[in-house]
């Protein structure tokens, strides 16, 4: 488990390129036949990836010991979105088939969660966010047909994109975790511009569906102290509440966003005008 401490905005603005990457970038999300796990002190979110190829991968008691509990989800909820080939997730003996861009919410209290791929030639890639939970909501599969899509932006401003809301109150109940998938239209490069912060929630972006020769310049920092981190395919970045979170790519891309914090009101954000950015 890779533990990342919280960081003050006044400290963050003094960091050089490598310093910013060390604090906020999750460089390797998927490792064959293993799970990766980054634990952030910011709202206690855990992010990572699971890519089973030649064997199943389970997340259970061994992680619980690192969290000071008996098992991983004793006091947590889990959200998973599969960006790879078809797979299965077995939760306490109940098997769910999770296809490409299907998702599974796992409620607090699940003791054993086992991940597998259907075809080793096209393995599943399970990206997950995990957050503290105060009660148990039912484990539920969510398919792309069940999400709440919203299309925003314009080709003229190169920010035409569709936001697919997987884990939001209109789709299913969670304690605090919200997740979704945003896909840019072909030829569009910007996400979340004009940008915003949200004092009451933190967020993690996971960029994927990118060519090897492409990258995204992820914008972060306070609106008057902006910085950037260069992101490549299948990498994640942590965004504290005080930071903007926006990006521009060399080509179109897709990203998964996950939020935890005070509320689940998607539009509860503090907008920043482009003219006010520095």
Curated annotation (Swiss-Prot):
Gene that specifies this protein? kduI
UniProt cross-references to Gene3D superfamilies, sorted A to Z: Jelly Rolls, pectin degrading enzyme 5-keto 4- deoxyuronate isomerase, domain 1
Q: How is the cofactor bound?
A: Binds 1 zinc ion per subunit.
Q: Which HAMAP family match?
A: KduI
Q: Which organism is it from?
A: Escherichia coli (strain 55989 / EAEC)
Enzyme Commission number, as recorded = 5.3.1.17
The UniProt family comment states: Belongs to the KduI family.
The record's annotation in NCBIfam families points to: PRK00924.1 (NF002091)
Q: How does it assemble?
A: Homohexamer.
Any idea what this protein is called?
4-deoxy-L-threo-5-hexosulose-uronate ketol-isomerase
